[in-house]
Design a protein with these regions (language model features):
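Peripheral interaction segments used for macromolecular assembly
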Residues: 1-5, 9-188
Length: 188
């Protein structure tokens, strides 16, 4: 029995790269399975929209989402736990990195991302909805510790573009289903 393969490449709406999928079965309407690294394949729960590759701006012309280190007029409430300096744990319980900073949405007055410093020196953004902040660390169910290196990084250390936000959030979304092989199976 020959598996019919479908690769989606170089769509005019995806100027910046390929994304791949193939049918899981040989019949029409079969669910698609990602090819390659499922966290970066751009399909299923890891799909992302081709948004503008520029930062979202405030009505004053400043980058809307920035780290606290460049937004001195924002901070963590004294009544809340400040996670900066705490370890970040992946779904496997291993340390993925350490909280380096928090990224604030200046227009909505809320934190959008946790900046994670990885052991190799890289930095990745962790969307707040994927994080469970506790007194002794930050837990992330979506990814294993080693998979944080697969999260797309930002070009600038002080702002994030709308396209980068899409790809970052898509990576964590993909992790919900593809981080481990057993997550793809039905839950009974």
């Amino acid at each position: 029995r020959r598996q019919r393969q479908m690769c989606i490449r170089d769509s005019p709406n995806r100027r910046d790269g390929d994304y791949h999928a193939e049918p899981a079965h040989g019949w029409i309407g079969s669910p698609l399975e990602p090819l390659g690294n499922p966290l970066r394949a751009g399909v299923g729960p890891g799909a992302w929209a081709q948004r503008a590759d520029v930062p979202d701006m405030t009505m004053h012309g400043e980058a809307k989402i920035v780290p606290l280190r460049v937004a001195p007029d924002h901070g963590v409430s004294k009544r809340d736990n400040d996670p900066r300096g705490l370890p970040v744990y992946g779904a496997d319980g291993a340390v993925a990195g350490q909280v380096a900073d928090l990224w604030v949405d200046r227009m909505e007055m809320m934190f959008r991302y946790i900046e994670v410093a990885l052991p190799d020196g890289g930095r990745r953004l962790l969307p707040i909805p994927f994080a469970r902040i506790k007194k002794d660390g930050v837990e992330v169910h979506a990814l294993l510790a080693r998979q944080f290196a697969d999260v797309p990084s930002t070009r600038s250390p002080e702002q994030v573009t709308m396209l980068e936000e899409e790809k970052i959030c898509a990576c964590y979304g993909a992790g919900q289903l593809y981080a481990t092989p057993d997550r793809k199976e039905p839950i009974l």
